[in-house]
Swiss-Prot record:
It comes from the Eukaryota. Residues 308-322 have a biased composition (Basic residues). This is Uncharacterized protein C736.07c. It is found in: Cytoplasm. One of its GO terms (biological process) is formation of translation preinitiation complex.
Length: 699
């Protein structure tokens, strides 16, 4: 069985009853507006339309609730202890006992009462020892005191709401959404009201007296709600005043009287004896301790310490936490005593203790009243007139325009405002002559850090004061008639800020005509080290002589050409390498001499260049013509391509035998892995390390 679904059904039934009450009250309001109000054209009035709309919505919602309740009831199937559904067999029999028709259907729960009856009638819930339900009187006699106390705790005065009162009364709380419809465990019936339920017994479900007593005998709980479903254990114990506690105790006494009167007026059995069910209820009501409601005036700590066996023990504090709490308590006591001494002034300690003991009222143990101490007032600094210092502070803030105008008038009267300071303003609100108002600070150390330097005057340590220094700034410069000269920079930095927040600073230089003759030609030259300057001077001297340097250069170049020719004859080179060797020989050949006039024609060589180093130019004489020079430049213009081809050919020579490994473009078969993937390429460092062990792929 699913208890939560049953609880949901019961809760929806109670909401159904509340909504029906609200709809009735709205209907009465509509009738009053139409009949008793006597307003002409009241049917078209806005408030009547509003009430009609609410009435219609409530009716629709109530119908939906009723249909959902019936649907949920029909879905609840009775199951046995093994989880199998209990089947109902309906047969129609004639007078002779012949079966006319039969139908088998799973047994469903029609209401909460049927659920309780069916659940008790299942075979798994009978007493196995005697083979059936035992007698109630013998069961009650065998109950121990602990079991009776447990049953009273489980009941918690649910008897009035579950139907032990006369049938025309029920306990409900105020119709607030989200609040439980049942009174609290500790007898908080002050807000409860009695009314006649407008719903018939078929729509609203409630337990009868016999079902409740039967559940008490069997030791089961009368409340359908689970533990902690709607309210917590100590919910009613928190934040209660003495007046609420007394009203709760009186409400409990009234409920007890009504229950006992109902039990005394009940009917007798067939044997003439009073029913044992009423005796059980009377014993439970009389044995329930009423002092609990009265003793709730104590603090929550006292209630927690005087708990029953079922409540948890308080956690054991560590030594560190105990010491911390003790220091806090002692600190609070010291603060209280010191503040009292300050506030009481000239009184002695003995009088302080007397006034403190007299001001605190000890709680009466008989009435268990909570005495609320008045908050302690700490001493506050006061003025000579006895007014609080914090309240007597007057702020100089300007609260209105009138205060500002009054302040400006006072400053004009005292001469603080100068007539010259009121200058014209531009479109941005800035004063045009603001630079004239700038004055130098009188303190010479205004912009410097103050050091702790000390001087010893007459053996005494005295710090230097600013007033001891003479004022450096003259009064003529301080006057507004002779302002300081301002030096403007040669460039203007204009900062443009876009909407995205990026700032672009544009540096606008001054016109260059004024600065053309300021810098000499030496300032634009590159910085050359002293070693290169010395070397260039030596080379210039050798070129002028033209004896020793040319001879050495020709010898070296001849040696290089001979070595290159010998290597080309010994090794067979590709045609590409032959082209490369010819280019190198042409590059390394000694330049032919030519007159200096032709060089000046197409190179525009200035006279200043002679004093500076030009790399790889041993002399300023060029031996070739202009056309030959241009052709050579075109041939060797793409030196990067030549060097790249050189290193490609160099990579191929990885074996001493002179055999070449073809590139991927030249190779028809690409070596593959076992899985069919291309093998990774080896770097040139790996190939150089492996050398002869590199496999050569043949195809």
């Amino acid at each position: 069985m699913n208890d939560e679904r049953l609880v949901a059904i019961n809760f929806e039934q109670q909401i159904f009853s509340k909504i029906s009450e609200i709809s009735e009250s709205v209907g009465r309001a509509i009738r009053y507006c139409k009949e008793d109000g006597k307003v002409e054209g009241c049917e078209t009035a806005s408030h009547v339309d509003f009430l009609n709309h609410i009435h219609l919505l409530l009716g629709n919602y109530n119908n939906d609730l009723a249909s959902s309740i019936e649907k949920k009831k029909s879905e609840l199937i009775v199951r046995n202890s093994e989880g199998l559904p209990v089947m109902d067999i309906h047969e129609e029999v004639d007078k002779d006992g012949n079966i006319i028709s039969a139908s088998v259907a799973p047994q469903r729960i029609s209401s909460v009462i049927d659920y309780a009856d069916v659940f008790r009638s299942l075979p798994g819930f009978k007493n196995i020892e005697n083979g059936g339900n035992r007698d109630t009187s013998s069961r009650i006699e065998e109950l121990s005191e602990e079991e009776i106390n447990d049953s009273t705790k489980n009941i918690n005065y649910k008897a009035p709401e579950m139907g032990s009162l006369p049938s025309n009364t029920e306990f409900t709380s105020t119709p607030t959404l989200g609040v439980s419809e049942f009174p609290s465990k500790h007898g908080d019936h002050s807000d409860s009201k009695t009314y006649e339920s407008p719903i018939s017994n078929s729509q609203a479900a409630s337990l009868s007296d016999s079902d409740m007593v039967q559940q008490i005998k069997n030791g089961s709980k009368t409340s359908l709600f689970k533990k902690g479903f709607l309210f917590k254990k100590n919910n009613a114990m928190q934040n209660r005043t003495t007046s609420n506690i007394k009203s709760n105790a009186s409400a409990i006494e009234k409920n007890k009287e009504t229950i006992l009167n109902a039990l005394n007026n009940s009917t007798l059995n067939e044997n003439g004896h009073q029913d044992t069910q009423n005796e059980v209820l009377r014993d439970i009501v009389l044995e329930h301790p009423t002092a609990k409601a009265q003793d709730t005036g104590e603090s929550n700590k006292d209630n927690n310490t005087s708990t029953s066996k079922h409540k948890k023990r308080p956690k054991r504090l560590s030594k560190f936490k105990q010491a911390k709490l003790e220091t806090k308590k002692s600190g609070n006591k010291d603060h209280a005593t010191s503040s009292e001494k300050l506030s009481l002034g000239n009184e002695s300690i003995h009088s302080i203790n007397e006034t403190r003991s007299s001001s605190i009222e000890e709680p009466d143990n008989a009435d268990n009243k909570i005495v609320e101490e008045e908050p302690m007032l700490l001493p506050v600094p006061t003025t000579a007139q006895g007014q609080n210092v914090l309240e007597a502070v007057q702020y100089d803030g300007l609260d209105s325009l009138e205060d500002m105008e009054a302040l400006i008038q006072e400053m004009e009267e005292e001469g603080e405002l100068d007539d010259n300071s009121e200058s014209e303003e531009d479109e941005h609100g800035m004063t045009i002559g603001f630079s004239k108002e700038l004055k130098a600070p009188p303190d010479p150390q205004y912009f410097t850090e103050k050091t702790g330097a000390t001087t010893y005057v007459n053996g005494n340590d005295e710090s230097l004061n600013v007033s001891d220094f003479p004022q450096i700034v003259e009064q003529e410069e301080l006057s507004s008639k002779n302002p300081r000269k301002v030096h403007f920079s040669d460039t203007l930095e204009i900062k443009h800020v876009s909407r995205s927040g990026k700032a672009n600073i544009e540096v606008i230089p001054a016109p260059t005509e004024e600065y053309d003759n300021l810098f000499g030609p030496d300032d634009f030259q590159s910085r050359i080290s002293a070693f290169r300057k010395a070397r260039s001077k030596l080379r210039a001297k050798e070129n002028e002589e033209g004896n020793h340097s040319n001879a050495t250069c020709t010898i070296k170049n001849d040696d290089l050409s001979n070595t290159l020719n010998n290597r080309a004859a010994n090794t067979k080179l590709n045609p590409k390498e032959e082209d490369k060797s010819t280019v190198e020989s042409e590059l390394k050949a000694p330049p032919k001499e030519k007159s200096s006039e032709t060089s000046k024609e197409y190179l525009n060589e200035p006279s200043v260049v002679k004093d500076f180093v030009v790399e790889r130019t041993p002399s300023d004489k060029i031996s070739e013509s202009k056309e030959a020079f241009d052709a050579k430049v075109e041939e060797i213009s793409d030196q990067r391509a030549i060097s790249q081809r050189y290193y490609e050919l160099r990579k191929k020579m990885i074996d001493n035998t002179g055999e070449y490994i073809k590139d991927e473009e030249e190779q028809a078969v690409i070596p593959l892995d076992e899985n069919g993937n291309e093998k990774p390429k080896m770097s040139r460092f790996m190939t150089a390390r492996l050398r002869g062990r590199v496999p050569i792929y043949e195809h």
